[in-house]
C-alpha cells in the first residue's frame, strides 16, 4: 500500500476569517473557494477549511510549516497579524503559534 497525506481539514465557524488568515497572513495560494469549503496549497499537501462546528472535545492537528529562516519568517508573519511565541532552539529551531480558531501551528527548520 502506498498512501500519502493529501489534505488536513479544519472545521470552522469562521470560514472567511480563517481563509483570510491562511491566504493573506500565511501567504498560501487558495485553490478552492466555495461557500462552505476552501482549500489552500501548502506545498505538497492541502489545508482545507470546512464550514461547520468542530467536533466537541476534539482538538485539531498541529500543522508544522517548514521555514529555512525561522526568525525572519516568524517576524514577517507576526507583522501580518499571526500569533507566534518565542523561537526555541534545540537540534533545530521551532516556534509555536495559533490560527484564529486556536488550532496549533508551528514554524520549524527541521
Put a short name on every predicted segment.
Residues 29-61, 104-110:
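Conserved short beta-strand elements that form part of the metal-binding/catalytic scaffold
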Residues 1-19, 46, 61-63:
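N-terminal beta-strand motif that seeds the catalytic metal site of vicinal oxygen chelate
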Residues 23-24, 41, 78:
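Alpha-helical segments within the soluble intracellular
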Amino acid at each position: 500500500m502506498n498512501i500519502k497525506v493529501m489534505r488536513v481539514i479544519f472545521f470552522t465557524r469562521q470560514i472567511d476569517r480563517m481563509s483570510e488568515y491562511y491566504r493573506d497572513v500565511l501567504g498560501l495560494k487558495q485553490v478552492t473557494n466555495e461557500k462552505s469549503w476552501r482549500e489552500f496549497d501548502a506545498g505538497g499537501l492541502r489545508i482545507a477549511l470546512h464550514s461547520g462546528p468542530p467536533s466537541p472535545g476534539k482538538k485539531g492537528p498541529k500543522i508544522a510549516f517548514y521555514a529555512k529562516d525561522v526568525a525572519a519568517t516568524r517576524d514577517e508573519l507576526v507583522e501580518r497579524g499571526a500569533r507566534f511565541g518565542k523561537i526555541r532552539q534545540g537540534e533545530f529551531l521551532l516556534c509555536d503559534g495559533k490560527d484564529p480558531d486556536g488550532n496549533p501551528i508551528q514554524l520549524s527548520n527541521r
